[in-house]
Regions:
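A structural motif shared across PLP-dependent enzymes of the aminotransferase-like
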Residues: 77, 105-116
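Glycine-rich cofactor phosphate-binding loops and adjacent beta1-alpha1 units
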Residues: 195-252
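Mid-domain Rossmann-like dinucleotide-binding core that forms the NAD(H)/NADP(H) cofactor-binding site
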Residues: 127-205, 210, 244
Length: 252
């Protein structure tokens, strides 16, 4: 029987067998070639370190109801993205064929039976590892579009994981003339500098908000992106942003 990676309790992962469902006319069967987790959000969920683990989500109000039980036994599949190869095609599927490389937001398991319209074809010549970055790139692009980066803007990015690094690069493509990156991890700051930021600050050794204000003639950043999910970073991002500026929070 095929296997999948699941969490049966906070912080504990196991391999579990499962039975694959019959193939419906609009579905395809996919054999996994490469899968990945989401380093930030998913690992916090794996550790039960998010409101999803303690407070019931109200889909109508779009908020967590504090103190109300989720009724969740915690059992959940792990994994965020998967690249695979189509091995079977339903009778009504015309968009895909056997041997196509496809990818989607899917958990870590050996096979997937899924509607064809939920899958995207993988471009030729693109590695599985690169395709896994489709997810953070999607969030980064959405953040930069929400921030409405314009030609000549001064931009600050707090949190230099994959999303933050891509936000900085997308902001430059959007016309930002000066970009400062903030993260306590040295190798992340160095990566930001290699990819085009003008300055990288360590918030554990400097007052990032104060320094950025001073570096911008006491004005601050026109647009600030907070991608780390840290309350301290969010506070620093607020202090960094200029009067009537824009702060985009992308973290969960």
């Amino acid at each position: 029987m095929p296997r999948e990676l699941i969490a049966d309790r906070p912080g504990h992962a196991i391999l579990s067998t499962y039975e694959e469902q019959p193939l419906a006319p609009d579905q395809v069967r996919v054999t996994s070639l490469f899968s990945s987790v989401k380093h930030g959000t998913e690992l916090r969920g794996f550790r039960a370190d998010t409101p999803d683990a303690s407070d019931r989500w109200d889909g109508q109000l779009r908020l967590h109801r504090r103190g109300e039980s989720t009724g969740d036994d915690f059992l959940r599949r792990l994994g965020n993205m998967c690249l695979g190869i189509v091995t079977e095609v339903g009778a009504e599927v015309e968009s895909l064929k056997v041997a196509d490389r496809v990818f989607a937001h899917l958990p870590i398991r050996e096979t997937h039976t899924i509607a064809a319209n939920r899958l995207q074809k993988a471009p030729d010549g693109v590695s599985p590892q690169a395709i896994m970055y489709w997810d953070p790139a999607d969030f980064a692009l959405g953040a930069v579009r929400d921030g409405s980066v314009r030609l000549g803007d001064r931009v600050a990015v707090f949190g230099l994981g994959a999303i933050g690094l891509m936000v900085a690069q997308a902001a430059r493509l959007g016309g930002a003339r000066w970009i400062v990156a903030v993260d306590p991890i040295e190798r992340r700051r160095q990566a930001a500098l290699r990819h085009g930021t003008d300055l990288a600050l360590d918030p554990t050794t400097t007052d990032a908000g104060l320094e950025i204000k001073q570096l911008t003639d006491n004005i601050g950043a026109d647009i600030t992106f907070e991608t780390s999910g840290s309350y301290r970073a969010f506070e620093d991002a607020l202090r960094t942003t200029c009067y009537a500026g824009t702060l985009v929070s992308t973290a969960y």
